[in-house]
A protein has these predicted regions:
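Well-ordered alpha-helical segments within folded domains of soluble proteins
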Residues: 466-484, 526
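Beta-strand/loop-rich accessory regions of lumenal/periplasmic or secreted enzymes
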Residues: 108-402, 437, 442, 446-454, ...
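Intrinsically disordered, low-complexity Pro/Gly/Ser/Thr-rich segments with frequent PxxP/GP/PP motifs
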Residues: 65-88
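Structural helix-adjacent loops and short alpha-helical linkers that scaffold large soluble proteins
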Residues: 483-496
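Asparagine-centered strand-capping/turn motif at beta-strand->loop junctions
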Residues: 5-15, 217
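Solvent-exposed beta-strand/loop surfaces of large extracellular or lumenal domains
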Residues: 36, 41-67, 347-356
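Surface-exposed beta-strand/loop patches in extracellular or lumenal glycoproteins
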Residues: 11-37, 226-248
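Low-complexity, Ser/Thr/Pro/Gly-enriched N-terminal "stalk/linker" regions
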Residues: 387-463, 508-525
Length: 526
């Protein structure tokens, strides 16, 4: 009997790149492979795959249980191809793995790889220069916090780099994680330093990078009146907080498929795309009340101001920005932009800024003690970026069943009588996405949370009655299980959004968050 394929890949049909980049967690059966063995990723149609295989979890006998596979392959025939892991048929020649090219000084950290170089200041908040194919870009963070955090001293408290190597024996790292931990120290000794973490995840030779950021308020809460509510004295009140990148000789462009403006012209005046609400039917939902029990949104319409033309439109923005220097370009695409309002994209000649938070006047964002907020965007740079497309991976449910990594998981579950009821979570009138709209489960704190509408059974009246699940792990596990069984990316999206909300908002112990992706989720998440 032939062993089933481990996973398959799919790319968007509208993209024109010839190569596919992928990152996927893959399970392995107990006793099959050990860390000492060199594993390669193979396509069943024989086409070339360049991939790094990194151990992530082990069975009790120390055999590999989960590995992270990150790599690149041609898009030719990809839709029909299957992927497996195996030992190479021929023992590859000895090759010394090269450490990333790093230079450190008391005030700088420089990381060079392929045609890019990050030169990072240690005494400023994620600030420095990015050099791509010889072209220089400057980047940094803009912030406007209210007292006692209005005057902060930033310092790079810790950083580390994790390289991954492919099976080609070139010796070069093909994938790098660079993580930077900052402390933002207030002049008020009664408050603990805020924490800001940046992780750059990039394919070194392919011009693609993900920028992940997390802002944490680690201070203990007062719990006035024995409650955990808004308005705590140690809350961080944010008026503006964002990351910018610029080039003195560059030109900037903004684009958005949902907004009406002329995007072909380069930016030559102050321009802005500002998402102030979800612009949904229930944008004024009680979930958006502030500590004074007042609505934190005064005007729901999105602001579109480009090259002097300004309008307010009821749209859900999904912007992208381009910064061009000659033939070298940099493209910035935020993830889940409108869902995490209030947020904005601004630009001027030669500069683009993504405002993680941009609050309305007199409605600052309140990051409570114990809360954090994470954001992510994609960066595409260098002449290679347009040649590659990010692929979506699907694990083969037969292989997951064979590996026995998830208790009671079986492809036979799709024929269970309960499956038709479970499917209503996607297709029913009260599916999970419809519930989001009903309560307007959007905004930076709410997005990903689940509306517990079953608790409204005895509610009288027409007004919305917000309530949320407190056993978040059950639906998180369920969403992932349904994704594995069906391959439906909607289940995976629900799991990703919920897990991010749990990590950022719901879990806090001893002043620090516990990353509770659950071992299963850690392995799924690329």
């Amino acid at each position: 009997m032939l062993e089933p394929i481990y996973f398959s890949l799919k790319t968007p049909s509208h993209d024109t790149g010839s190569g596919a980049l992928f990152s996927v967690g893959v399970p392995l059966p107990k006793g099959r492979f050990f860390a000492i063995q060199q594993l390669v990723c193979c396509r069943d149609d024989g086409k070339d795959v360049s991939a790094a295989v990194v151990p992530k979890a082990f069975w009790p006998d120390n055999s590999l249980k989960w590995v992270l596979v990150q790599g690149e392959t041609t898009r030719q025939g990809l839709e029909q191809a299957g992927f497996t892991l195996c030992e190479p048929q021929q023992i590859p020649p000895y090759c010394k793995q090269q450490s990333p090219d790093i230079t450190t000084t008391p005030d700088k950290v420089e990381v060079r790889c392929a045609d890019t170089s990050w030169l990072i200041d240690t005494d400023q908040l994620f600030s420095g220069t990015l050099t791509v194919a010889g072209k220089l870009f400057q980047f940094g963070v803009k912030s406007k916090f209210r007292a006692p955090y209005d005057t902060l001293q930033a310092t790079l408290s810790d950083w580390h780099i994790t390289p991954s190597y492919d099976n080609k024996c070139s010796g070069e790292a093909v994938f790098i994680d660079l993580t930077l931990h900052y402390q933002l120290i207030s002049k008020t000794p009664a408050t603990m330093p805020l924490e800001f973490t940046v992780t750059l995840k990039y394919f070194t030779h392919f011009g693609h990078c993900e920028l992940h950021s997390t802002l944490l308020n680690p201070n203990p809460a007062e719990h006035a009146g024995g409650t955990w509510d808004l308005g705590d004295q140690r809350s961080l009140l944010i008026e503006d907080f964002g990351w910018f990148i610029k080039a003195e000789e560059g030109t900037a462009h903004l684009s958005d498929d949902n907004a009406t403006f002329t995007s072909a012209e380069p930016i030559h005046t102050e321009s802005m795309l500002w998402q102030r609400s979800s612009n949904g039917q229930h944008w004024d939902s009680p979930v958006h009340l502030n500590h004074q029990r007042e609505l934190s949104i005064s005007n729901p319409l999105s602001v579109i101001e480009v090259n002097g033309e300004k309008s307010e439109q009821p749209v859900r923005l999904m912007p992208a920005g381009n910064l061009q220097q000659g033939e070298t370009g940099l493209r910035i695409v935020p993830h889940k932009f409108w869902q995490n309002f209030p947020t904005a994209f601004t630009a001027r000649s030669g500069e683009i800024c993504w405002h993680f938070f941009k609050a309305e006047a007199n409605h600052p964002v309140e990051l409570q003690p114990g809360e954090q907020k994470s954001h992510c965007c994609e960066l595409a740079f260098s002449v290679n970026a347009g040649r590659y497309v990010k692929a979506t991976a699907r694990l083969n449910p037969e292989w997951v069943t064979h590996c026995a990594v998830i208790p009671w998981f079986s492809t036979a579950l799709t024929s269970d009588p309960l499956q038709s009821l479970i499917n209503l979570g996607q297709t029913g009138e009260q599916n999970f996405f419809a519930k989001r709209e009903r309560i307007d489960e959007y905004g930076w704190r709410n997005f990903g949370d689940l509306y517990a509408d079953h608790e409204t059974a005895e509610h009288q009246g027409d007004e919305l009655f917000p309530s949320h699940y407190n056993n978040q792990y059950d639906p998180l596990y369920g969403f992932l299980k349904q994704w594995l069984l069906s391959g439906d990316e909607q289940w995976k999206a629900l799991a990703d959004d919920l897990a991010r909300h749990i990590i950022d908002i719901d879990i806090f112990i001893m002043g620090y968050y516990i990353n509770i992706m659950i071992k299963i989720f850690k392995c799924f998440k690329s």
